[in-house]
Amino acid sequence: MWLYLAAFVGLYYLLHWYRERQVVSHLQDKYVFITGCDSGFGNLLARQLDARGLRVLAACLTEKGAEQLRGQTSDRLETVTLDVTKMESIAAATQWVKEHVGDRGLWGLVNNAGILTPITLCEWLNTEDSMNMLKVNLIGVIQVTLSMLPLVRRARGRIVNVSSILGRVAFFVGGYCVSKYGVEAFSDILRREIQHFGVKISIVEPGYFRTGMTNMTQSLERMKQSWKEAPKHIKETYGQQYFDALYNIMKEGLLNCSTNLNLVTDCMEHALTSVHPRTRYSAGWDAKFFFIPLSYLPTSLADYILTRSWPKPAQAV
């Protein structure tokens, strides 16, 4: 019996391996539009796809970022400036893409642009910072997707939305987690709504990686600033010792961020080029072996595991 079971499992993984490696044909003729290409995942993905021969349309927030990217890639790659929080900028970028892709449509849309600032507790976070994260990480994704959707539908292409493992397990930085949970929900809803048009939607959930968003110096400085600007009653409730302990925990976490960004961009590339893309990709060992298993535990147990090393506030009961 065990021999039959082992043979069945082996056959399953062999078929899975074969299925995962089926690649879309004529990649050199396909256009992919990527947001957030100034740095980080978007920048690396743009260079990675360009090296593979795809026609990359890279959206950068700044002209400086666009110029630097053009200097690192072939003449095939073209850039446009895009602020995903402004509808007029999205409309202009959509028209620009339309002029480039023509009747063939847009094969790939990668919603990668995102921000994480500041790293702090919900109660310390001001409304403006929360709204900025929602505007970029969630509303921007929705507006760019809906604007580009007719072009993607024409090509029967792919949409890749970059969420986070914190869109699966909410842990710290409330505004960021809320925005990423929203990306997950939007992606699931849209995937079901447009399933009959041949468009495939994938969600990429990176763990902790060292990018511009997790720059240690900037992140810790913003955390200090957030605490400094917190109302007096907040400081009395939590206490300076609580902040200092939490600051050290965050510092250690940022130091342990992975530097291998290819773990994420390889997932994005697979979602764009595979005949059978996955619905979800968990990128990074922390995502695969800690956060994903954690998401299936009873909530009370997950809460304990996530917060067991946290300090207690000054006025804790």
UniProtKB/Swiss-Prot annotation:
Primary location class: membrane
Location within or outside the cell: Microsome membrane; Early endosome membrane
Reactions listed under catalytic activity: all-trans-retinol--[retinol-binding protein] + NAD(+) = all-trans-retinal--[retinol-binding protein] + NADH + H(+); all-trans-retinol + NAD(+) = all-trans-retinal + NADH + H(+); androsterone + NAD(+) = 5alpha-androstan-3,17-dione + NADH + H(+); testosterone + NAD(+) = androst-4-ene-3,17-dione + NADH + H(+)
Tissue: Detected in liver and prostate (at protein level). Detected in adult liver, lung, brain, placenta, prostate, adrenal gland, testis, mammary gland, spleen, spinal cord and uterus. Detected in caudate nucleus, and at lower levels in amygdala, corpus callosum, hippocampus, substantia nigra and thalamus. Detected in fetal lung, liver and brain.
Binding of substrate, residues: S164
EC top class, as a word: oxidoreductase
Topology class, membrane: Peripheral membrane protein
Catalytic residues as annotated in Swiss-Prot or TrEMBL: Y176
Pfam families linked: adh_short
EC nos: 1.1.1.105, 1.1.1.209, 1.1.1.239, 1.1.1.53
Gene Ontology CC terms, in alphabetical order: early endosome membrane; endoplasmic reticulum; intracellular membrane-bounded organelle
One GO biological process term: androgen biosynthetic process
Glycan attachment points: N161, N215, N256
Key words, A-Z: Endoplasmic reticulum, Endosome, Glycoprotein, Lipid metabolism, Membrane, Microsome, NAD, Oxidoreductase, Signal, Steroid metabolism
UniProt signal peptide: 1-17
Family: Belongs to the short-chain dehydrogenases/reductases (SDR) family.
Role summary: NAD-dependent oxidoreductase with broad substrate specificity that shows both oxidative and reductive activity (in vitro). Has 17-beta-hydroxysteroid dehydrogenase activity towards various steroids (in vitro). Converts 5-alpha-androstan-3-alpha,17-beta-diol to androsterone and estradiol to estrone (in vitro). Has 3-alpha-hydroxysteroid dehydrogenase activity towards androsterone (in vitro). Has retinol dehydrogenase activity towards all-trans-retinol (in vitro). Can convert androsterone to epi-androsterone.
Protein name as catalogued: 17-beta-hydroxysteroid dehydrogenase type 6
Organism the protein comes from: Homo sapiens
Taxon lineage: Eukaryota, Metazoa, Chordata, Craniata, Vertebrata
Gene giving rise to this polypeptide: HSD17B6
